């Protein structure tokens, strides 16, 4: 497993392809897996790698909280496509298999205090989730206006970047280009979000992060479903 050398364009391309249908390196929330890969990259990916750039900017916003993100940080070779080997020079040794936390770990293996605490916390969370009854999910339909810099902006690429933003509770809908004057067109795009998972602030932060294409974003319409 791995991404190749994340300090090279080839490695970043592998990362971009890997994130084309994923919001995070593992699972549905930021974790130590994202931190490990983020720290292996020397800087923001180029704008044409929109999936990798979207992920990079999102994880960067967790800079102050990265130590508290869930999971156990492992070596880069533990993440990414199975068919690619990690060759990023990090100087860090691979994490030992004994460090992996097994939710149903064997009783006859010695556990560190941290590992034992983490396993107990996960078991408690699992039991808590199982006990909860399904709640009604509040959703909203949002119409966004995404404005380019000028009439030379590649609107196809702009829309591709916007749609590359993925999150649990976010579904993109139809879109169209609307003239605003002087040959400039804005992207008007519909999306449906789960209110407790996705907000307009998060959408604006991630969309405007594609600063090579996007000048600004506005909410044109907002309706509860």
Curated annotation (Swiss-Prot):
PTM comment text: Phosphorylation affects the GDP/GTP exchange rate.
CDD domains the record matches: EF1B, GST_C_eEF1b_like
SUPFAM superfamilies: eEF-1beta-like, GST C-terminal domain-like
Subunit and partners: EF-1 is composed of 4 subunits: alpha, beta (alpha subunit of the eEF1B subcomplex), delta (beta subunit of the eEF1B subcomplex), and gamma (gamma subunit of the eEF1B subcomplex). Interacts with elongation factor EEF1A1.
CC annotations in GO: cytoplasm; endoplasmic reticulum; eukaryotic translation elongation factor 1 complex
Job description of the protein: Catalytic subunit of the guanine nucleotide exchange factor (GEF) (eEF1B subcomplex) of the eukaryotic elongation factor 1 complex (eEF1). Stimulates the exchange of GDP for GTP on elongation factor 1A (eEF1A), probably by displacing GDP from the nucleotide binding pocket in eEF1A.
Naturally occurring in which organism (per UniProt): Rattus norvegicus (Rat)
Protein name: Elongation factor 1-beta
SMART domains named in the record: EF-1_beta_acid, EF1_GNE
Keyword field: Acetylation, Elongation factor, Isopeptide bond, Phosphoprotein, Protein biosynthesis, Ubl conjugation
A single MF term (Gene Ontology): translation elongation factor activity
Domain GST C-terminal: 1-85
Residue list for modification Phosphothreonine: 88
Pfam families per record: EF-1_beta_acid, EF1_GNE
Family affiliation: Belongs to the EF-1-beta/EF-1-delta family.
InterPro entries: eEF-1beta-like_sf, EF-1_beta_acid_region_euk, EF1B_bsu/dsu, EF1B_bsu/dsu_GNE, Glutathione-S-Trfase_C_sf, Transl_elong_EF1B/ribsomal_bS6, Transl_elong_EF1B_B/D_CS
């Amino acid at each position: 497993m791995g991404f190749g050398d994340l300090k090279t364009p080839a490695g970043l391309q592998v990362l971009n392809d890997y994130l084309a249908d994923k919001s995070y390196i593992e699972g549905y929330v930021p974790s130590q897996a994202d931190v490990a890969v983020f720290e292996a990259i020397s800087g923001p990916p180029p704008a044409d790698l929109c999936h990798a750039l979207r992920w990079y900017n999102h994880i960067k916003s967790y800079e102050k909280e990265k130590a508290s993100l869930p999971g156990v940080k492992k070596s880069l070779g533990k993440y990414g496509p199975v068919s690619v080997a990690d060759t990023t020079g990090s100087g860090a040794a691979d994490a030992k298999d004994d460090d992996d936390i097994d939710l149903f770990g064997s009783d006859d293996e010695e556990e560190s205090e941290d590992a034992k605490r983490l396993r107990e916390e996960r078991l408690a969370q699992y039991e808590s989730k199982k006990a909860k009854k399904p709640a009604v999910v509040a959703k909203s339909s949002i119409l966004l206006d995404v404005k380019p810099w000028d009439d030379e902006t590649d609107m196809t690429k702009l829309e591709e970047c916007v749609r590359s933003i993925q999150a649990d509770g976010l579904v993109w809908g139809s879109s169209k280009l609307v003239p605003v004057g002087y040959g400039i067109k804005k992207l008007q795009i519909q999306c449906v979000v789960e209110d407790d998972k996705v907000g307009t602030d998060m959408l604006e932060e991630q969309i405007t992060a594609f600063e090579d294409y996007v000048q600004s974003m506005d909410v044109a319409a907002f309706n509860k479903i």
